[in-house]
Amino acid sequence: MYKYILFDLDGTLTDSAPGIMACIRYACEKMGIECPGDSVLRAFVGPPLMDMMKKTFSLTDPEAEKMLAFYRERFSTIGLFENSVYPGVGEMLSAVKSSGKKLALATSKPEVYAVKILENFSLSGYFDAVTGSELSGAHVEKRDVMALSMQKLSAKKEETLMVGDRKFDLEAANELGVDALFVSYGYAEKGEEIPYRPKF
């Protein structure tokens, strides 16, 4: 019986791809880099952005930091709100909360942005804890934010369920010994979840 439910944000509760992709395009323009097509940009939804920028554009750490600063320049004021809640999410969170579960948000997105997004969509009240990365780059790995969320809730791993849409969520759940529920409507590539064998 699960008492603690951890939720990913992007691709699980909200469709944030439009804002993220627009901000990557903006950062590419600022950096003078040719921007790839949408199929490549969609891969930026979910994983830590610095890692994706270095890998996709062959950037050094300082170059990736500069690109991330340009990304945040637009995201913090515009991109964050180019986002929508998936149908039924509010009702689902309400039902889970009403059943007596403790809920936490566990996202690699900076916590300061995650809080604003939840507030913007009136979802804050469902969560007992919100955990994201720091703007400094700390706690950017999914395992770290999940572990911190569990710490905030005083959650035992055998009583915890992670809900997410990407391999990063499932891999982190496996590493922490937590069951996972994979949502298929998010940003995962076809079959991405199979090697991680989520419980649901």
Tell where the protein language model's regions lie, with residue ranges.
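A short, structured active-site edge motif that brings together acidic residues
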Residues: 69, 124-139
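Active-site neighborhood of HAD-like aspartate-dependent phosphohydrolases
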Residues: 1-43, 54-59
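Acidic, Mg2+-coordinating phosphoryl-transfer loop and its flanking beta/alpha structural elements
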Residues: 162-200
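Short, acidic loop-to-helix structural element flanking the phosphoryl-transfer center
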Residues: 77-105, 111-115, 143
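Conserved Lys-Pro-Asp/Glu-containing loop-to-beta segment of HAD-superfamily phosphomonoesterases
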Residues: 4, 141-171
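Conserved H-loop
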Residues: 34, 123-128, 156
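A metal-dependent, Asp-based hydrolase signature
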Residues: 46-77, 87-91, 95
